[in-house]
């Protein structure tokens, strides 16, 4: 509840083009975002995709229990599996979620980094399920940067957050390391690493 109240103070903005991207309803999608943008992901689902439950991968170990509670606060459903090495079990579990018609959210640089280094898990799942990847971006007017490997962004109450997005269709997604680099470049383009006037960054369609 506290997280939702915090989010309610934020001035979330998105261009009409970005909103049209977010509300796409012809297929379940893979939402890809940097680990340090996780705080804002629940707002995407509540505002634009309320009929598409969003699932995220969490470690099956005992250490994953705290993450389940945190993800529930963000409005995410937990899929238990090996999030460290993105093993076969995790790929199958996430593919099943997409095939039954729900969305999944993945942080390609999580759960332990390095920051902004893309692992191939997101592209593997998207290619296997023939699902488009929504490259999700958030630009902050003012945010605290927490200590940690990802420099987690915590937007300050009553500040503006500008949401951005673009799709990489399944047919356009490269395989292996090329696909990982393709996704990394798209994420970097939509997520400025400095605090800016969020309205200056336009949606990339």
Positions of predicted regions on the chain:
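Short amphipathic alpha-helical segments and helix-helix/interface helices
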Residues: 19-23, 68, 122-126
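Catalytic core of membrane glycerolipid acyltransferases/transacylases, capturing the structured
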Residues: 27-85, 145
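A transmembrane-helix-recognition feature enriched in membrane-embedded lipid enzymes
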Residues: 1-15, 40, 44, 69
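A generic local structural motif
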Residues: 15-19, 43, 91-93, 150
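Non-catalytic C-terminal accessory region of glycerolipid acyltransferases
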Residues: 1-8, 48, 73, 77, ...
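Short linear elements at protein peripheries
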Residues: 13-30, 34
